[in-house]
Amino acid sequence: MHWADVIAEKLIEERKADKYIVASGITPSGHIHVGNARETLTADAIYKGLINKGVEAELIFIADTYDPLRKLYPFLPKEFEQYIGMPLSEIPCPEGCCESYAEHFLRPYLESLDDLGVELTTYRADENYKKGLYDEKIKIALDNREKIMEILNKFRANPLPDDWWPINIVCENCGKLKTKVIKYDSEKEEITYRCEICGFENTVKPYKGRAKLPWRVDWPARWSIFNVTIEPMGKDHAAAGGSYDTGVLIAKEIYNYIPPKKVVYEWIQLKVGDKAIPMSSSKGVVFAVKDWTNIAHPEILRFLLLRSKPTKHIDFDLKKIPDLVDEYDRLEDFYFNNKDKDELSEEEQEKIRIYELSTPKIPETKPFVIPYRFCSIIAQLTYDEEKEDINMERVFEILRRNNYSIDDIDEFSMKKLKDRLLMARNWALKYGEKLVIISEDEAKEIYEKLKDKQKEWIKYFAEKLKTAEFDALNLHELIYQTAKELGLNPRDAFQASYMILLGKKYGPKLGAFLATLGKDFVIRRYSLFE
């Protein structure tokens, strides 16, 4: 059984509810990356697991748009220093294209979630506060200040100061959340505050967006507002004494609410060179979710994040995207070959379920696919710079030479193929190896430096090419056959070929590569050396 189904089953056993609310959230303080997506996709998998069990469920997403800007991040201009301490929703867009700072980073992520097949209800914290959703919770927190302090102090090395209050007023003068409570009148429900930034003082009701609860109180408050029953969280929140532990006590003792079941997930680290570094928006170590569909289909990201338990650490290496896509293609193959079988082992059932959870829209029949690496080569050779598009006629010529049957490709597969070609080209140019065929003059120079036996083979192979069946399988066999006839190690034949084509000793699978380059070009290249 897939881990999401196991979690859903346990939740139903442990907690009876008319409707199960699965929550996820993010603070849009910077580019929202693949590491952040693990939380949302974990929540989505659990939600789908609940639906699969036949219960009513909803997936909600709460964007912490009312959190303050905490510092000047590396990607921000110097002038944004003036906004430190202001709620993200009240700060201008850093590029002038959105209504606020928060929306600038949030909107692309929400659009990406739509591409990823995630259906959810989105709430923005600034709107929640301004609509008064938190008003009752704020009143309860203020009236129970000492109890909340007692709970928080249980997990603190240094106790909170006696004048601490579970509220942050938004200064009416400078708009910052750096204020100090001077007095609270419970009967009038008014707070007198002083801004620690500009010195402004006033007395206000802390409602309708005039104030915000601190995180450790805000979180349990929202659980009770939205009736949250389960929520994935990073290991920092779930650590002993972390915000989940304090949230559990505040939910029970202050808000009289049964806290949600926690699902802890591990970080995703981005491979940079030989190092794996935890993704961090604030440090600029990110691969934004919005950039994913430039290099691969959404289901590949879902597969990456949902095939393993949330507690499993993931190292994300952009150079290995082709391997990841190949794994998904094999899984898709398995799904369509086995989905209708009556008897499957537990492992086989789990593979079927991984495919179902990874693929937002499962096609009726198995799509026609070309391996991603091969697509990256074809796309670079068939891209029309003038039209800024793939020349599909040339693609089909190459596929025929590579023994692909393309007569019955359906419309869905055709679109998917073209998308993959464009994505694979983007990947190759940015993260893989750009395919550069060296010039004839360069090839001649390299030829002179080859071993005599390699030179002899190139000329012999050139003659054989003129009458050869020009497809990948025949060319592959011809390389081995001609090398054997001349007593040359096939490895030396391959290296010689790569050298006169690419200027290096390695490259794509040679038979397929030669078929892809085409008969005229290949014969001309191997015949240069008279």
Curated annotation (Swiss-Prot):
A motif ('KMSKS' region) lies at residues 278-282. The keyword Nucleotide-binding applies. PROSITE patterns: AA_TRNA_LIGASE_I. CDD domains: LysRS_core_class_I (cd00674). A motif ('HIGH' region) lies at residues 28-36. Its EC number is 6.1.1.6. It is found in: Cytoplasm. Its main location: cytoplasm. Gene3D superfamilies: 1.10.10.350, 1.10.10.770, HUPs, Lysine tRNA ligase, stem contact fold domain. Belongs to the class-I aminoacyl-tRNA synthetase family. PANTHER family: LYSINE--TRNA LIGASE. This is Lysine--tRNA ligase. It comes from Methanocaldococcus jannaschii (strain ATCC 43067 / DSM 2661 / JAL-1 / JCM 10045 / NBRC 100440). The lineage of its organism: Archaea, Methanobacteriati, Methanobacteriota, Methanomada group, Methanococci. The gene is lysS.
